[in-house]
Protein backbone atom coordinates (compact mmCIF):
# COMPACT_ATOMS: atom_id res chain seq x y z
CA UNK A 1 0.00 0.00 0.00
CA UNK A 2 1.23 3.46 -0.82
CA UNK A 3 -0.22 6.52 0.88
CA UNK A 4 0.88 9.97 -0.26
CA UNK A 5 2.10 12.42 2.37
CA UNK A 6 1.98 9.86 5.16
CA UNK A 7 4.23 9.16 8.11
CA UNK A 8 4.80 6.15 10.29
CA UNK A 9 3.87 6.23 13.94
CA UNK A 10 7.57 5.75 14.62
CA UNK A 11 8.41 8.99 12.80
CA UNK A 12 5.49 10.83 14.37
CA UNK A 13 6.82 9.98 17.82
CA UNK A 14 10.42 10.73 16.87
CA UNK A 15 9.48 14.12 15.46
CA UNK A 16 7.10 14.79 18.37
CA UNK A 17 4.16 15.57 16.12
CA UNK A 18 0.96 15.81 18.13
CA UNK A 19 -2.25 14.43 16.63
CA UNK A 20 -4.75 17.03 15.48
CA UNK A 21 -7.45 15.30 17.56
CA UNK A 22 -5.78 13.41 20.42
CA UNK A 23 -9.06 11.87 21.64
CA UNK A 24 -9.98 10.40 18.25
CA UNK A 25 -6.38 9.30 17.69
CA UNK A 26 -6.40 7.43 21.01
CA UNK A 27 -9.73 5.80 20.13
CA UNK A 28 -8.27 4.59 16.85
CA UNK A 29 -5.43 3.02 18.83
CA UNK A 30 -8.00 1.28 21.02
CA UNK A 31 -9.44 -0.34 17.90
CA UNK A 32 -5.97 -1.34 16.74
CA UNK A 33 -5.37 -3.01 20.11
CA UNK A 34 -8.70 -4.81 19.85
CA UNK A 35 -7.98 -6.00 16.31
CA UNK A 36 -4.44 -7.11 17.15
CA UNK A 37 -5.75 -9.13 20.09
CA UNK A 38 -8.50 -10.67 17.98
CA UNK A 39 -6.11 -11.81 15.23
CA UNK A 40 -3.15 -12.24 17.59
CA UNK A 41 -0.88 -10.00 15.56
CA UNK A 42 2.36 -10.27 17.47
CA UNK A 43 4.28 -7.88 15.23
CA UNK A 44 2.54 -4.56 15.78
CA UNK A 45 5.15 -1.86 16.09
CA UNK A 46 5.34 1.85 15.39
CA UNK A 47 6.98 1.18 12.02
CA UNK A 48 3.99 -0.68 10.64
CA UNK A 49 1.37 1.89 11.49
CA UNK A 50 0.95 4.62 8.88
CA UNK A 51 -0.81 7.92 9.47
CA UNK A 52 -2.21 9.72 6.45
CA UNK A 53 -2.48 13.49 6.09
CA UNK A 54 -6.08 13.42 7.43
CA UNK A 55 -4.81 11.59 10.55
CA UNK A 56 -6.38 8.30 9.51
CA UNK A 57 -4.45 5.32 10.81
CA UNK A 58 -3.52 2.43 8.51
CA UNK A 59 -2.33 -0.88 9.94
CA UNK A 60 0.13 -2.63 7.68
CA UNK A 61 2.06 -5.90 7.84
CA UNK A 62 -0.09 -8.67 9.25
CA UNK A 63 2.29 -11.46 8.27
CA UNK A 64 2.52 -12.58 11.89
CA UNK A 65 -1.21 -12.58 12.61
CA UNK A 66 -3.70 -15.40 13.14
CA UNK A 67 -1.50 -17.27 15.56
CA UNK A 68 -2.75 -20.43 17.20
CA UNK A 69 -2.83 -19.02 20.71
CA UNK A 70 -6.21 -19.09 22.40
CA UNK A 71 -5.21 -16.42 24.90
CA UNK A 72 -5.28 -12.74 24.16
CA UNK A 73 -2.03 -11.06 23.23
CA UNK A 74 -2.17 -8.11 25.63
CA UNK A 75 -5.34 -6.36 26.73
CA UNK A 76 -3.70 -4.08 29.28
CA UNK A 77 -4.08 -1.07 26.97
CA UNK A 78 -7.53 -2.02 25.70
CA UNK A 79 -9.84 0.15 27.81
CA UNK A 80 -12.44 1.26 25.26
CA UNK A 81 -14.36 -0.08 22.28
CA UNK A 82 -16.50 1.49 19.58
CA UNK A 83 -20.20 0.70 20.20
CA UNK A 84 -20.98 -0.84 16.80
CA UNK A 85 -17.89 -3.05 16.95
CA UNK A 86 -18.87 -4.10 20.48
CA UNK A 87 -22.36 -5.02 19.30
CA UNK A 88 -21.09 -7.01 16.32
CA UNK A 89 -18.41 -8.71 18.40
CA UNK A 90 -21.14 -10.07 20.67
CA UNK A 91 -23.75 -10.97 18.07
CA UNK A 92 -21.93 -12.35 15.04
CA UNK A 93 -22.44 -16.09 14.77
CA UNK A 94 -19.41 -18.39 14.78
CA UNK A 95 -20.72 -20.00 11.58
CA UNK A 96 -20.82 -16.63 9.81
CA UNK A 97 -17.23 -15.86 10.84
CA UNK A 98 -16.13 -19.31 9.72
CA UNK A 99 -17.87 -19.00 6.34
CA UNK A 100 -16.20 -15.67 5.61
CA UNK A 101 -12.73 -16.72 6.77
CA UNK A 102 -12.47 -20.33 5.56
CA UNK A 103 -11.14 -19.38 2.10
CA UNK A 104 -8.26 -17.56 3.79
CA UNK A 105 -7.52 -19.29 7.10
CA UNK A 106 -7.03 -22.84 8.27
CA UNK A 107 -9.74 -24.30 10.54
CA UNK A 108 -7.50 -24.18 13.62
CA UNK A 109 -6.68 -20.50 12.95
CA UNK A 110 -10.39 -19.71 12.84
CA UNK A 111 -10.99 -21.73 16.00
CA UNK A 112 -8.30 -19.76 17.85
CA UNK A 113 -9.75 -16.47 16.62
CA UNK A 114 -13.22 -17.44 17.85
CA UNK A 115 -11.82 -18.31 21.29
CA UNK A 116 -10.03 -14.97 21.45
CA UNK A 117 -13.24 -13.21 20.45
CA UNK A 118 -14.98 -14.76 23.45
CA UNK A 119 -12.16 -13.59 25.72
CA UNK A 120 -12.37 -10.08 24.28
CA UNK A 121 -16.10 -10.05 25.00
CA UNK A 122 -15.40 -11.04 28.60
CA UNK A 123 -12.67 -8.41 28.92
CA UNK A 124 -14.80 -5.58 27.54
CA UNK A 125 -17.87 -6.62 29.54
CA UNK A 126 -15.73 -6.63 32.69
CA UNK A 127 -14.58 -3.10 31.90
CA UNK A 128 -18.20 -2.02 31.38
CA UNK A 129 -19.24 -3.62 34.67
CA UNK A 130 -16.39 -1.89 36.53
CA UNK A 131 -16.35 1.55 34.87
CA UNK A 132 -19.76 1.93 33.29
CA UNK A 133 -20.83 1.75 29.66
CA UNK A 134 -20.25 5.43 28.91
CA UNK A 135 -16.64 5.24 30.11
CA UNK A 136 -15.85 2.19 27.96
CA UNK A 137 -17.97 2.42 24.81
CA UNK A 138 -17.72 5.27 22.32
CA UNK A 139 -19.30 6.27 19.03
CA UNK A 140 -17.38 7.77 16.15
Model-predicted regions and their roles:
Residues 1-140:
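Phosphate/dinucleotide-binding and metal-coordinating scaffold of catalytic cores
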Amino acid sequence: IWIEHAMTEKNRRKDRIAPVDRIRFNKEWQMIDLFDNLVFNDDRNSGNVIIDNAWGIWMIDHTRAFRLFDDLKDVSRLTQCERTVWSKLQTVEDAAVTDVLKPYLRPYEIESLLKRRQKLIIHIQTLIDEKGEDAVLFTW
